[in-house]
């Protein structure tokens, strides 16, 4: 029965009830199989384990313990990595409620920025209940138009250990969060937040039909089965962690091993250790994670990684240097070039839009070939570090992609433009202060705001459309500049931002680069690095950088999802450089 459903022989899922019933049947087909392992500090040797039956029972039991009587309640969940967090996400869905997991702060997020983002969400997201740690719930009591319920965790996590400063409730002031008015959607399963870094993250309404379609199609492309194991350090408030690393294996009866993001940052070897111990077959990672592991590779060569069929880079764009270094560093531990895979994804389509072909090396296109006709894709050239654009794979079944030029015309192969997508898993709107707001689509097509091109049916993502820097009529992609600067010795790789600064005198933009220095900051060394960066950018990119600023570590602004915020970093740069005084 389960395998028939996976092959698509069973009718599709359209309602919440159908989804939950189908999920229960799938999981109870192997009730004693260990499906979920959650690591809890400090005892990393003994993850908390749940069999399929125990997972279902504990999840529903925990969700029921809050005594939520209102049907289809929107429940905000603000908890750190813990078994309870995974149980709540599943249990609230099974009980017919609509969970929304809010970002828990990591050790690398600026406390003030995090508090501002949290206050904005509490001020603008209609809900019926907030579940969080006891002290924080007490702190918020009276500041929200809905209850804040405290929940103690087995690992004794504390909000105050991370942010002992002013209470969040003081930031709310007298402004009440919007009252709950209606249901996001009759078949909404949960809300997930867009991973954008340009302003407040939006709550995407994910329905039963959207999720079921995504899980079925992605599972088929990856040839996922109940024999597979996913290992992850990605948080549940991010679509990669929530969909690819939790719901996808659950739906297909596969196991998953979940590591806290904070623990992984401190000890990246945990990911490889658990991949080897549990013979993981899939692992999703952003660009910086591949580099982060490669840079520490010499100390992590004792783990056998040959079981992993796919290390999937889910970034826009995929960086050749990131995957190449990872493949080279861990080749002796069983990592094959063909296991390096890629995907293009976003919360607005639940998750994946494209996926590279398993077992085949990533395709690439030399940068010089873009906009040229009759050029063929080749296998990823591992010796051409970032002289190529790397494929994010082909569209999932039933998913369409087209590239649109500025004038609205459809671009031919190899010609870059804005990426538009149409798929059955595409969202219909956001949930916010005004309730459910329908997202306008043009003939069912969603304009992603990303810039890229198609070659031989595969998608190549270049970057964000609005981030392009126009210098003297030439289009400069900031991601290209960042890739060049990341290679400079003394610069913290992955902590570089390029953007445009308006030049009213010349009627164009000037190229600006901000890069964090590796190690302790030194002004003389920073000046030398700035000179090196200017020369390298001019040589490789062919455009002079008007402004180059080498800064101390953690100067660059990141979102709560851990992504560099180009907009906020640019604003900080402009304030520091051009503000009077």
Regions found by a protein language model. Give the residues of each.
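Conserved AMP-binding/adenylate-forming
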Residues: 63-109, 233-236, 475
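AMP-binding/adenylate-forming catalytic core of the ANL superfamily
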Residues: 276, 283, 423, 428-429, ...
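Conserved AMP-binding/adenylation subdomain of ANL enzymes
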Residues: 212-229, 239-281, 296-300
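Gly/Ser/Thr-rich phosphate-binding loop
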Residues: 280-284, 296-386, 400, 408
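Conserved C-terminal "lid"/linker of ANL adenylate-forming enzymes
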Residues: 495-502, 512-513, 534-581
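Conserved AMP-binding A3 loop
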Residues: 46-55, 189-213
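Conserved ATP-binding/catalytic segment of the ANL
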Residues: 390-402, 406-414, 418-478
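Conserved pre-ATP/AMP-binding loop-to-beta segment of ANL
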Residues: 31-34, 170-200, 214, 220-229
């Amino acid at each position: 029965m389960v395998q028939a459903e996976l092959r698509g022989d069973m009718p599709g899922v359209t309602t919440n009830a159908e989804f939950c019933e189908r999920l229960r049947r799938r999981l109870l087909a192997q009730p004693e199989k260990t499906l979920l392992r959650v690591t809890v500090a400090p005892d990393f040797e003994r993850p908390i384990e749940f069999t399929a039956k125990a997972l279902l029972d504990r999840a529903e039991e925990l969700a029921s313990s809050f005594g939520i009587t209102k049907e289809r309640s929107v429940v905000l969940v603000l908890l750190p990595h813990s078994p309870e967090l995974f149980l709540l996400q599943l249990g609230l869905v099974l009980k017919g409620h609509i969970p929304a997991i809010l970002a828990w702060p990591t050790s690398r997020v600026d406390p003030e920025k995090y508090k501002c983002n949290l206050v904005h969400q509490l001020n603008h997201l209609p809900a019926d209940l907030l579940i969080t740690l006891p002290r924080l719930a007490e702190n918020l009591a009276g500041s929200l138009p809905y209850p804040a319920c405290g929940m103690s965790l087995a690992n004794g996590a504390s909000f105050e250990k991370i942010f002992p400063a002013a209470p969040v409730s003081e930031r709310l002031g007298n402004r009440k969060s919007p009252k709950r008015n209606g249901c996001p959607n009759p078949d909404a399963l949960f809300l997930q937040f867009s991973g954008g870094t340009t302003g407040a993250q939006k709550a995407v309404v994910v329905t039963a039909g959207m999720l079921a379609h995504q899980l079925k199609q992605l599972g088929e492309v990856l040839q996922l089965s109940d024999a597979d194991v996913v290992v992850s350090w990605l948080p549940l408030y991010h679509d990669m962690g929530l969909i690819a690393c939790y719901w996808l294996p659950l739906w297909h009866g596969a196991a998953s091993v979940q590591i806290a993001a904070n623990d992984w940052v401190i000890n990246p070897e945990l990911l490889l250790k658990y991949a080897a111990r549990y013979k993981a077959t899939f692992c999703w990672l952003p660009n910086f994670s591949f580099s982060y592991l490669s840079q520490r590779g010499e100390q992590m060569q004792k783990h056998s990684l040959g079981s992993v069929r796919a290390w999937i880079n889910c970034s826009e764009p995929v960086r050749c240097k990131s995957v190449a270094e990872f493949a080279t560093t861990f080749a002796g531990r069983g990592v094959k070039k063909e296991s390096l895979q890629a995907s293009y994804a976003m919360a607005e389509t639940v998750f994946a839009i494209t996926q590279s072909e398993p077992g085949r090396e990533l395709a690439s296109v030399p940068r010089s070939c873009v906009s040229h006709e009759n050029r063929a894709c080749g296998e990823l050239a591992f010796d051409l570090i970032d002289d190529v654009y790397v494929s994010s794979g082909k569209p999932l079944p039933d998913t369409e992609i087209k590239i649109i030029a500025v004038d609205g015309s459809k671009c031919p192969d190899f010609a870059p433009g804005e990426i538009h997508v149409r798929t059955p898993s595409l969202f219909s709107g956001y949930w916010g202060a005004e309730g459910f707001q329908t997202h306008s689509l043009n003939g069912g097509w969603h304009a992603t705001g990303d810039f890229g091109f198609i070659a031989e049916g595969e998608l190549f993502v270049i970057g964000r459309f609005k981030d392009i820097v126009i210098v003297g009529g030439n289009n400069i992609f900031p991601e290209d500049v960042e890739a060049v600067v990341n290679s400079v010795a003394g610069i913290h790789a992955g902590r570089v931002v390029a953007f445009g600064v308006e030049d009213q005198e010349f009627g164009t933009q000037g190229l600006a680069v901000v890069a964090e220095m590796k190690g302790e900051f030194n002004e003389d060394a920073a000046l030398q690095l700035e000179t090196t960066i200017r020369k390298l950018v001019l040589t490789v990119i062919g455009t002079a950088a008007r402004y180059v600023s080498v800064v101390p570590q953690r100067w660059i602004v990141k979102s709560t999802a851990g992504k560099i915020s180009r907009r906020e970093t640019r604003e900080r740069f402009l304030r520091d450089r051009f503000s009077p005084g």
